[in-house]
From Swiss-Prot:
Belongs to the protein kinase superfamily. CAMK Ser/Thr protein kinase family. PIM subfamily. It catalyses: L-seryl-[protein] + ATP = O-phospho-L-seryl-[protein] + ADP + H(+); L-threonyl-[protein] + ATP = O-phospho-L-threonyl-[protein] + ADP + H(+). Residues 30-290 form the Protein kinase domain. This is Serine/threonine-protein kinase pim-2. Its EC number is 2.7.11.1. ATP binds at L36, G37, S38, G39, G40, F41, G42, S43, V44, K59. The lineage of its organism: Eukaryota, Metazoa, Chordata, Craniata, Vertebrata. It comes from Danio rerio. It holds the Pfam family Pkinase. The keyword Phosphoprotein applies. Proto-oncogene with serine/threonine kinase activity involved in cell survival and cell proliferation. GO terms for cellular component: cytoplasm. GO terms for molecular function: ATP binding; protein serine kinase activity; protein serine/threonine kinase activity.
């Protein structure tokens, strides 16, 4: 387990949304409903805002599960790093505009000595990409291309704000099953973006690159590109390329599905063993496979018969 530490996040010129201490303040504004999911990060519940009935998702995190803390202007005590990152990406009442491809934090509350509650928008007709692939199987390349482009654009926005997600995977991507629009979720493993090496990692191991498995260090951009390569393989082949550490460090995916040469080329490029050989995000977007046309909204609506899980 990582040592608990305070991570300073630059949030200058933001109007910071301040926590309303105590559960009674939360209960005056929101109603918590059924459990949607749980894991090492905590639990997520459905809910709604009392003032207007807006549906929301509420993430409940116990204090003892929080590994990274941040100082925020206007707050006396450090807050969970995830809250600071989401605030700088346009969450709450801050002045920074958000991005359509990133889930928006609406509010947050501290229950002193116990937990934090983070309130998110709850897009309708959505399910995570993991379930989307599980129910549908391997995706057509045109649909995978469309999803990947949106994920990259969301990641680029994060990087422009000095933030790296560090846990890009199918479970952290919501798909609107009517329109094909996506939103990146769960910044619990995120960090401030820096040029130097990282020596901590709280993301998903099967999406992590060889340099982390072997040396427990990595740079943010090659790590992100590796995870995008795993994600693309997952979408077009129906499952992730590597399950074991020994396979990750070999960096040689096997293709059990018939996919185009250009798609295979992009996957292998992103999954290069040497971090320096991996493309940049801009180079991925300019790859011949990415330049091909994708399905439009109508095509997705016609094909999708999946019942949304959220």
């Amino acid at each position: 387990m990582l040592d608990k530490r305070i991570v300073d996040v630059r949030l200058d010129q933001l109007e910071i949304l301040k926590a309303k201490n105590g559960k009674e303040h939360f209960e005056k504004q929101y109603t918590m409903g059924n459990l949607l999911g749980s894991g090492g990060f905590g639990s997520v519940y459905s809910g709604h805002r009392i003032s207007d009935g807006q549906k929301v998702a509420i993430k409940q995190i116990s204090r003892d599960r929080i590994q990274q803390w941040s100082k925020m202007p206007g707050e006396v005590n450090p807050v969970p790093n995830e809250i600071a990152l989401l605030q700088s990406l346009g969450g709450g009442s801050g002045s920074v505009p958000g991005h359509r491809g990133i889930i928006r934090m609406l509010d947050w509350f501290e229950i002193p000595g116990q937990e934090y509650l983070i309130v998110f928008e709850k897009p309708q007709h959505c399910q995570d990409l993991f379930d989307f692939i599980t129910e549908r199987g391997a995706l057509d390349e045109s649909l995978a291309r469309r999803f990947l482009k949106q994920v990259i654009e969301a990641v680029q926005f994060c990087h422009s704000k000095g933030i790296v997600h560090r846990d890009i995977k199918d479970e952290n991507i919501l798909v609107d099953t009517r329109t094909g629009d996506i939103k990146v979720i769960d910044f619990g493993s995120g960090a401030t973006l820096k040029d130097s090496m990282y020596t901590d990692f709280e993301g998903t191991r099967v999406y992590s690159p060889p340099e982390w498995i072997l040396y427990h260090k990595y740079h943010a951009l090659p790590l992100t590109v590796w995870s995008l390569g795993v994600l693309l393989y997952d979408m077009v082949c129906g499952d992730i390329p590597f399950e074991q550490d020994t396979d990750i460090v070999k960096a040689k995916p096997s293709f059990n599905k018939r996919i185009s040469n250009d798609c295979r080329s992009l996957i292998c490029s992103c999954l290069s063993y040497n971090p320096g050989d991996r493309p940049s995000l801009e180079q991925i977007l300019q790859h011949p496979w990415m330049m091909e046309s994708s399905v439009d909204n109508g095509d997705l609506q016609e094909e999708s018969k999946i019942k949304p899980s959220l």
